[in-house]
């Protein structure tokens, strides 16, 4: 049996050495997999950013604690501190497609350094990867080629700024393509929203709130087999509101239903997992503009917020 090991990708050169690619820049590497020889599988622990896509492949990849079947036209983005790849089984694989790796040091002092983690797809699970259309594939390949061409030029005072500009452009395109994916998967996403609602119903029916309090975005995302970032982005696209607000609004409606059925405020606060009635009062007023007591006075005249 082949022993499993994790390769530490401390810099772009470590990855390039693994696949047999020669770099021309210490902080950036673009690899056309068609130009490298077959390699053995390996789990990689990244200290660099990476954007990977394959033209065609059937590879069962690991990412964090999850697995993913790497399909044609799929983009995966990794950030420092993440693990990806496949355990070495002794077989050689011919990778296809492209890879862009860049070290965080390249971004020092740039605007991108400050907001790169705003691209939440770096924290998506691999089974939430971007599936490109043919047009999107061509755009990203074109950018890969432009970065590769720039890397082959003689280094000058502007090269790093140009490279960062290309990288930011690629990230913005990835964000646009993810937005498209959220929209085109509307039917699937609609089913997910129904599952989200059912999850919240089950949470309260099973009295989990009595020991764990209000459900969190992290809890719901995990139950629905998503990363918190992808789940939050998806709910935002579907409802126009954050996942945390969606959970709170669901809770507010439960409070109203309980009050309308004759329960007192302290009883409702306890049943819904609030440590003190004041906590319920504060959240209710924030969302409705008035307190539960005010709601009880208005309930016969004007239901709802």
Q: Residue locations for each model-derived region?
A:
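Terminal helix-turn-helix DNA-binding modules in bacterial transcription factors
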Residues: 237-275, 297-305
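An amphipathic alpha-helical interaction segment
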Residues: 138-201
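Generic protein-terminus/edge-of-domain signal
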Residues: 1-69
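…primarily DNA-binding HTH/wHTH and HhH modules…
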Residues: 281-305
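Short acidic-glycine-tyrosine-enriched beta hairpin
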Residues: 65-79
């Amino acid at each position: 049996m082949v022993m499993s090991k994790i390769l530490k990708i401390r810099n772009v050169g470590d990855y390039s050495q693994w696949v047999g690619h020669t770099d021309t820049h210490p902080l950036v590497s673009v690899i056309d997999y068609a130009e490298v020889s077959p390699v053995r599988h390996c789990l990689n622990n990244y200290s660099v950013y990476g954007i990977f896509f394959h033209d065609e492949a059937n590879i069962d990849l690991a990412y964090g604690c999850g697995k993913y079947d790497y399909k044609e036209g799929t983009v995966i983005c990794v950030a420092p501190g993440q693990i990806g790849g496949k355990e070495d089984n002794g077989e050689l694989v011919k990778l296809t497609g492209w890879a862009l790796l860049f070290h965080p040091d390249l971004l020092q002092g740039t605007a991108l350094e400050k907001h790169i983690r705003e691209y939440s797809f770096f924290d998506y699970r691999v089974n939430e990867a971007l599936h490109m259309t043919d047009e999107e594939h061509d755009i990203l390949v074109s950018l890969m080629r432009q970065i590769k061409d720039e890397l082959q030029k003689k280094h000058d005072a502007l090269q790093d700024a140009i490279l960062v500009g290309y990288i930011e452009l690629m990230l913005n395109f990835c964000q646009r393509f993810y937005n498209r994916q959220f929209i085109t998967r509307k039917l699937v996403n609609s089913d997910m929203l129904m599952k989200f609602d059912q999850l919240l119903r089950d949470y309260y029916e099973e009295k989990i709130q009595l020991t764990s309090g209000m459900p969190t975005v992290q809890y719901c995302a995990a139950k629905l087999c998503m990363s918190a970032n992808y789940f939050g982005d998806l709910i935002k696209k579907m409802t126009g509101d954050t996942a945390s607000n969606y959970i709170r609004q669901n809770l507010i409606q439960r409070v109203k239903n309980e009050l309308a059925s004759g329960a007192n405020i302290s009883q409702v606060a306890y049943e819904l997992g609030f440590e003190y009635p004041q906590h319920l009062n504060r959240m209710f007023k924030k969302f409705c503009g008035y307190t539960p007591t005010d709601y009880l006075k208005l309930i016969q005249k004007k239901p709802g917020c």
